[in-house]
Amino acid sequence: MKQVNDFVHRFGHESFSDNRSVSVWFTDLDQQQTDMAQLSWLSTDEHAKAARLKNPLERQRYLAGRVFTRLILSEVTGIAPEKLEIIRNQCGKPCLSLPTVGRRLRSKRLLRFNVSHSENFLCIATALGCDVGIDIEVENPGLDILAISHTCLDQEDNERVQCSSLNERSLLFYQLWTRREAFAKMLGHGVDSDHVHRTSAPPWSLRSLELTLEEKQIVGSLAIATPTTASASHF
């Protein structure tokens, strides 16, 4: 894994004790080597979903992503990967059910996390004491942004894209789109939900992600329900 900035950590390098901290972890799924022992960590439902994927590459990436997710959550919590119980809340958002005592977590504290992937890249955002949502997209140079902007964005954001210069259009589109997705995932609602709206004084913050991995440009957004110590640029 690569350390991109203050809230993107190397695996096993940073402690996770500050309840205001948020970490984002990246990996290239095509470079992840999974063995039978690691695959045994996965739940029956995870194996069943993998079996339904007919495309071998998609299946390999899915399994690698599930193993990587458990590795990160195990590193953060100190709980063995095979003992982690990933559940879904009432809105269907994945979350981690923790025992009352963990090596790095005090009693009754719930770790929040969110996962996003694009092509062969996957990222995980982890946080304590606040909801978090993350979304990333690999930039597609051949995408007709003006043609699809009005179907993906609300009126105000679409107008910003339509009026943007050619040089800034692609980055702006992906920033706006991933921001909306990350916010929806933080809330646990769909991106078209009425809950996804603007407010001038939100009890949440948005951070931008821009990085290059394996010669690909990745744009993303991180939505955090409360102010954190994460160091990143704002939109």
Residue ranges and their predicted role:
Residues M1-F235:
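Core catalytic alpha/beta fold that binds nucleotide/phospho-ligands
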